């Protein structure tokens, strides 16, 4: 059926029809109800093609063509189908009609998404604007292995109802393709400020940087935490030494009534690049009481090895405080080291930490001291390893680790000999003292206790001080 569409509002049912405009052919009624389902009014102004019929509709060429004037609802165009606006396909007598486009008349316009309101040729009513609805996509995703990936449309704003719904109203664990998933970029949690071992005296954070050209050692004192004060309140300060020189030191400001002080102070030591690797940085943490007396809480020893000074950036380091031994040194000095045995790998580990109170032979020139670690079996030499030499200090610090291959069946007859040796001028050397640890066959006292504790705590480092004795090397 033909439908007459008019942009002008339709008159009320009770009002008379408006008079025909000049030039309007009889039998035409352009009035249409404003509702999409209003019926068309038949025209009675003149003769038509038949009784009770009117004229309406437009052809694709812009000509007015007759159409039956009946009361009907305007059909809606289905998605993907074009609505027919042309002349009726049959004549009033039922015979099919054939239409020819006049020469010079414009060709039918191609369908577009939007048309403008314009007057049609031959005095017809203006065309009604319309918009073609967009086609709906059936899915928002395309499998990666599918060949449709290149031709698939991309929607920058996907419908929210197609995404997983969570109780909080967000996207939950869903992540769009191309977006960054923050779960993949989580850094491991820093537990240095939360995990403190049993019996910890406190922890100190500092930074070390060495300027090669200016020969300056830059030390940054950052903070301390979990300090164990002898009283209810703690007022800490830190003294910095550059061993072996213990006469000169630098001191931080005192922080009042806190066990977790924040220092953020910087210190400079002038030291030659030739001797920097032989120096040891010492931090002594004190508590200042009401009488302004200094009570030692603990200390940190940090050897300035080559690997710690590589690079242009400043290294931030933390160390646990250690209690300073209050026992007077033995006659020939003392040596501190750790023992550990891994029964699964059959590996015996020795960590040489430091020595104190050494009796150096300072008769000639500059001297240096190192420690020689020897593995013995049935008092026979098996293997030997040496630490680096520390220049002219009676309290050298090493912090060096050595490992030996030893089966569990050999531990009953094996022993370790640690000898402190002083280098003299030329190729001469002098033994300053020696410690032997092992089973009951070779040792007694603290040396035997250290060995037995190592066997009872596999894969753990057991640390102890031992007095040096002056004996000949086997």
Curated annotation (Swiss-Prot):
Domain C2: residue ranges: 200-317, 331-452
Parts forming coiled coils: none
Region (Disordered): 1-62, 75-128
Keyword Repeat attached: yes
Record key words, sorted: Repeat
Gene Ontology CC entries for this record: exocytic vesicle; plasma membrane
Domain of life the protein comes from: Eukaryota
Low complexity bias: start-end ranges: 75-88
Pfam family, one: C2
GO molecular-function terms, A-Z: calcium ion sensor activity; calcium-dependent phospholipid binding; SNARE binding
UniProt-listed GO biological process terms: regulation of calcium ion-dependent exocytosis; vesicle-mediated transport
Alphabetized InterPro entries for the sequence: C2_dom (IPR000008), C2_domain_sf (IPR035892), Synaptotagmin-15/17_C2A (IPR047897)
Gene3D superfamilies linked to this entry: C2 domain
Stretch forming the signal peptide: none
Family: Belongs to the synaptotagmin family.
Protein name from the UniProt record: Synaptotagmin-15B
Source organism phylogeny: Eukaryota, Metazoa, Chordata, Craniata, Vertebrata
Gene: SYT15B
């Amino acid at each position: 059926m033909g439908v007459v569409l008019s942009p002008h509002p339709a008159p009320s049912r009770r009002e008379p029809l408006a008079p025909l405009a000049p030039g309007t052919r009889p039998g035409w009624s352009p009035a249409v109800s404003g509702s999409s389902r209003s019926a068309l009014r038949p025209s009675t102004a003149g003769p038509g093609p038949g009784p009770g019929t009117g004229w309406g509709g437009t052809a694709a060429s812009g000509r007015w063509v007759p159409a039956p004037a009946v009361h009907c609802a305007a059909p809606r165009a289905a998605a993907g189908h074009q609505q027919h606006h042309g002349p009726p396909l049959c004549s009033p007598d039922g015979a099919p009609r054939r239409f020819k486009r006049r020469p010079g008349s414009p060709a039918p316009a191609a369908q577009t998404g939007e048309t403008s309101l314009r007057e049609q040729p031959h005095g017809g009513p203006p065309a009604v604007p319309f918009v073609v609805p967009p086609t709906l996509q059936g899915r928002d995703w395309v499998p990666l292995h599918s060949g449709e990936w290149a031709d698939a449309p991309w929607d920058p704003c996907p419908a929210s109802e197609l995404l997983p719904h969570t109780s909080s109203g967000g996207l939950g664990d869903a992540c769009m393709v191309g977006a960054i998933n923050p779960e993949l970029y989580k850094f491991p949690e820093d537990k240095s400020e939360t995990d403190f071992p049993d019996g910890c005296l406190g922890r100190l954070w500092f930074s070390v940087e060495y300027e090669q050209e200016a020969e300056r050692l830059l030390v940054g004192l950052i903070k301390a935490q979990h300090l164990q004060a002898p009283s209810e309140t703690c007022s800490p300060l830190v003294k910095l030494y550059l061993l072996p020189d213990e006469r000169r030191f630098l001191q931080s400001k005192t922080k009042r009534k806190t066990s977790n002080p924040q220092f953020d102070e910087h210190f400079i030591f002038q030291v030659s690049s030739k001797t920097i690797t032989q120096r040891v940085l010492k931090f002594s943490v004190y508590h200042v009481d009401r009488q302004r007396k200094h009570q030692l809480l603990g200390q940190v020893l940090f050897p300035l090895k080559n690997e710690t000074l590589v690079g242009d950036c400043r290294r931030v380091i933390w160390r646990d405080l250690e209690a300073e031994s209050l026992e007077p040194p033995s006659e020939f000095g003392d040596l501190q080291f750790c023992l550990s045995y891994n029964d699964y790998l059959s590996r015996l580990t020795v960590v040489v930490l430091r020595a104190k109170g050494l009796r150096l032979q300072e008769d000639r020139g500059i001297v240096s001291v190192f420690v020689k670690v020897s593995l013995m079996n049935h008092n026979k030499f098996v293997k030997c390893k040496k630490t680096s030499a520390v220049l002219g200090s009676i309290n050298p610090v090493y912090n060096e680790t050595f490992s030996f291959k030893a089966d569990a069946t050999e531990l009953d007859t094996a022993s370790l000999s640690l000898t402190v040796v002083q280098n003299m001028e030329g190729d001469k050397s002098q033994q300053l003292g020696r410690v032997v640890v092992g089973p009951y066959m070779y040792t007694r006292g603290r040396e035997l206790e250290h060995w037995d504790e190592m066997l009872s705590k596999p894969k753990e480092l057991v640390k102890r001080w031992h007095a040096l004795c002056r004996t000949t090397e086997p």
